[in-house]
Amino acid sequence: FPNNHENLEDYQRTLKYAYLYAKTVTLGKTHWPDTNRVMLRNRRIGCSVSGVAQFITNKGLEELKVWLEKGYDVIQEWDGMYSDWFAIPKSIKTTSVKPSGTVSLLVGATPGMHYPESRFYIRRMRLSKHSELIDPLKKAGYKVEPAFGSEDSTVVVEVPIDVGEGIRTAAELSIWEQFSLAAFLQRHWADNQVSCTATFDPETEADELPHVLNYFQYRLKGISLLPRHELGAYKQMPYEAITEKEYEKQVKKLGYLSFVGVEGEQAEVDKFCNNDVCEIPLMSETI
């Protein structure tokens, strides 16, 4: 989250610890031998940036370019140093731009490289219907409903959001500008694929798609496309634009949200198991 840092040095310090965490993960072992062989060889990681739209709004595109390039260089320096210390290969890929939707909510950042749907919008999140978070959310006035298509196992929670003044919205960006930003991040930061879902107006921009894809096929590793519709492309979309009046109406319904007494949820995972059969690695004795 570069926009959450006071200066470049502060940001580079965060990158160091993000890199160390990611690199340390590659020292572990999965229960898939094929995966282990690839990971031992490639040590592939992906330190991501998020809140890109906010950084551009506050500091400009040129400053973002400087931060990204210097940040990328410092990650390569750390990778060279720590790979030598660990006696392992340098990572073939080190940087990325991930969607970071839910994670971005925790720090008040826009997700990944994406601009907000509008200044005011509904953010929907999916939870297990057995989650201990549901009752506190309902008591605080948040709308909770069954997830379409997964009614037996999942619920969707709606949260009204105001991203503040000044920042542009996704509807204000042409399909060309969205592709250009993705290509900018691919060039100046990410050696993994940039995660980008470019939205477009099907009535005015649909004919542009063959041309924009043709031009950017040499500058992007991949991209997703989503048409913008007034009622949304599908039910319970993650982001839905609303008016300021609707936002204020939703906020007035909300009370105090307290998670006191809610215990953390730990996923139960059967390691090294396939159905009812488990693989137990044998430890050979060294004489």
Residue ranges and their predicted role:
Residues 44, 48-51:
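Catalytic-loop motifs flanking and including active-site residues across diverse enzymes
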Residues 92, 105-106:
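Short capping micro-motif at the N-terminus of alpha-helices
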Residues 265-287:
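Short acidic, low-complexity intrinsically disordered linear motifs used
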Residues 26-36, 51-99:
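Internal maturation/activation junctions in enzymes
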Residues 1-31, 41, 99, 106-270:
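Catalytic alpha/beta core of large soluble enzyme barrels
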Residues 12, 46, 69, 73, ...:
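Electropositive phosphate-/nucleotide-binding environments in soluble metabolic enzymes
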Residues 36-39, 43:
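Short, solvent-exposed segments of well-ordered alpha helices
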Residues 52, 101, 216, 278:
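Hydrophobic, well-ordered secondary-structure elements that form the walls
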